[in-house]
């Protein structure tokens, strides 16, 4: 069965989708079979792997709310070994519609169980909130990867996320683990970035990935071309660091 990893942080702009897309693509590049699950109604992970939102007939909404078979909604991408379970703005109504549904917190888990044997890794790109969609992701996951931006107030709000993780561990998924904390958007020219690294490592200790994602122009350009960085510019610093991260994730087992 696939290892299922949620990429979560309720703060926006910390590199969740960038990490979901590029970590998935780099693992696929290394020969791993990967499914990227987009449960953010903005659908940026979907477009980030080249899927046009206007071309999507069915999406993760139909799986969660309408009980459509997961396999029928999965799309191949232009990268070998990388598939996507796409999202559209239709998903924004799912949390309200699921409130009265029986076993509402395990809808995604049941959906992914249908296809788990086809993949080595499944990554879930979570929305910037701690609502029912993120709860579904954590319930379906073996672990959670937490991106933290190397900026002032980096740790703000993390206690809320960690409390949600503990509640899910207690009531819904006792095996949920912290995969690791990923430092993102580092500007090595500033003292602040170094201070944040020290602060995060002091708090999370060995749970912090060795790989740190720097600010990188090519990494920022890639989504507008609908390509992961490993396809857009394989020689860029952004591609190098996400390949390093992919190797760390494989080594974690």
From Swiss-Prot:
GO molecular function: ATP binding; ATP hydrolysis activity
Keyword Ribosomal protein: no
Keywords associated with the record: ATP-binding, DNA-binding, Hydrolase, Magnesium, Metal-binding, Nucleotide-binding, Sporulation
Alphabetical list of CDD domains matching this protein: ParAB_family
Highest rank taxon of the organism: Bacteria
Any coiled-coil regions, as ranges: none
UniProt family annotation: Belongs to the ParA family.
PANTHER family: P-LOOP CONTAINING NUCLEOSIDE TRIPHOSPHATE HYDROLASE, PARA FAMILY PROTEIN CT_582
Designated name of the protein: Sporulation initiation inhibitor protein Soj
Native species: Halalkalibacterium halodurans (strain ATCC BAA-125 / DSM 18197 / FERM 7344 / JCM 9153 / C-125)
Name of the encoding gene: soj
């Amino acid at each position: 069965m696939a290892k299922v990893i949620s990429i979560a942080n309720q703060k926006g702009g910390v590199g969740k989708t960038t990490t979901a897309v590029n970590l998935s693509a780099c693992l696929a590049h290394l020969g791993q079979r990967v499914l990227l699950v987009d449960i953010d109604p903005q659908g940026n992970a979907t477009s980030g792997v080249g899927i046009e939102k206007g071309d999507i007939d069915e999406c993760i909404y139909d799986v969660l709310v309408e009980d459509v078979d997961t396999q029928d909604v999965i799309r191949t991408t232009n990268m070998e070994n990388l598939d996507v379970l796409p999202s559209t703005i239709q998903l924004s109504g799912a949390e309200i519609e699921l409130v009265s549904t029986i076993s509402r917190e395990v809808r995604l888990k049941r959906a992914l169980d249908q296809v788990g044997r086809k993949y080595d890794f499944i990554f879930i790109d979570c929305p910037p909130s701690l609502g029912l969609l993120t709860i579904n992701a954590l319930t379906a996951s073996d672990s959670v990867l937490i991106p933290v931006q190397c900026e002032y107030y980096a740790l703000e709000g993390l206690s809320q996320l960690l409390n949600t993780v503990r509640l899910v561990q207690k009531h819904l998924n006792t095996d949920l683990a912290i995969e690791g904390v990923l430092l993102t958007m580092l500007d090595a020219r500033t003292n602040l970035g170094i201070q944040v690294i020290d602060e995060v490592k002091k708090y999370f200790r060995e749970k912090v990935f060795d790989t740190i994602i720097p600010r990188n122009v090519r990494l920022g350009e890639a989504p507008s071309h609908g390509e992961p960085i490993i396809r857009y510019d394989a020689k860029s610093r952004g591609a190098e660091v996400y390949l390093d991260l992919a190797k760390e994730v494989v080594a974690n087992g």
